[in-house]
Amino acid sequence: MVQIKAAALAVLFASNVLANPIEPRQASVSIDAKFKAHGKKYLGTIGDQYTLNKNAKTPAIIKADFGQLTPENSMKWDATEPNRGQFSFSGSDYLVNFAQSNGKLIRGHTLVWHSQLPSWVQSIYDKGTLIQVMQNHIATVMQRYKGKVYAWDVVNEIFNEDGSLRQSHFYNVIGEDYVRIAFETARAVDPNAKLYINDYNLDSASYPKLTGLVNHVKKWVAAGVPIDGIGSQTHLSAGAGAAVSGALNALAGAGTKEVAITELDIAGASSTDYVNVVKACLNQPKCVGITVWGVADPDSWRSSSSPLLFDSNYNPKAAYTAIANAL
């Protein structure tokens, strides 16, 4: 059905003059444009220099169908500051330049995270030194892309499954206050960027991790910590899409201005699951956008579970068509 519909659409719209030529197998109007028509900011995906150059179909699909890009790895600490005070931006510059030249919003990912953290950072046990290093890292990375990045994941994956704060290196050395320091540093560097806390397994309203995050965010926001949004990664197992609506509504009650689905992929990529997630964002006024964590299955970190909207041949799946029709 997808191939038949795509072929018909290709004939129907072959004569149209479009600013961004689309792949003939895709919908005539991008799913991003359809999503924005409902008042949302973007329906995006991820990219980096390797994946953008690996297969020519990847940038073509991004240009045709997605309105936002998140760097998969090139803005993480190990990529941007592998040695203390020695910054490297070649990978992140490539992604930002591609996004800007093609009119895509950018979500910066990620500034403070316990993983992909260089050993030199993990070897710092003096509180004052680690605070200075963290602030310098945030300031240097954000300053380079000031005015170019719509939103930043300032802190990433800082909660345990029981809703308590993860005992990361930053937590163990600085204490909970590292969260406030990180957000206040980020706000000072780029007052116009949206500042997010991002985490996974926030997919059920009653799950302890979600309720713990909401309670902490309420406390931080009330104390003046400049958290603008909550990002729910939304890496789902098959059949889990139905619970996302309730989860987003719960996250929206934490007191931030925005929520977003930041790393969406769904095992099996069923049409029902994907449409449920898209509708969950559509129906929550604070949900500004969705980022799918990859274009096609071969480039997914969960490739064996076929979780994305495009298959191993970079052709759209039934879930892609279902989203286009639902919008």
UniProtKB/Swiss-Prot annotation:
Active-site residue list: 157 (proton donor), 263 (nucleophile)
EC main group: hydrolase
EC number: 3.2.1.8
GO cellular component, one term: extracellular region
InterPro entries named in the record: GH10, GH10_AS, GH10_dom, Glycoside_hydrolase_SF
Catalytic activity annotation: Endohydrolysis of (1->4)-beta-D-xylosidic linkages in xylans
Main location: secreted
Pathway, per record: Glycan degradation; xylan degradation
One example GO MF annotation: endo-1,4-beta-xylanase activity
SMART domains: Glyco_10
GO annotation terms (biological process): xylan catabolic process
Paired cysteines (S-S): 281-287
Keywords from the named record: Carbohydrate metabolism, Disulfide bond, Glycosidase, Hydrolase, Polysaccharide degradation, Pyrrolidone carboxylic acid, Secreted, Signal, Xylan degradation
Cellular localisation: Secreted
Protein name per the record: Endo-1,4-beta-xylanase
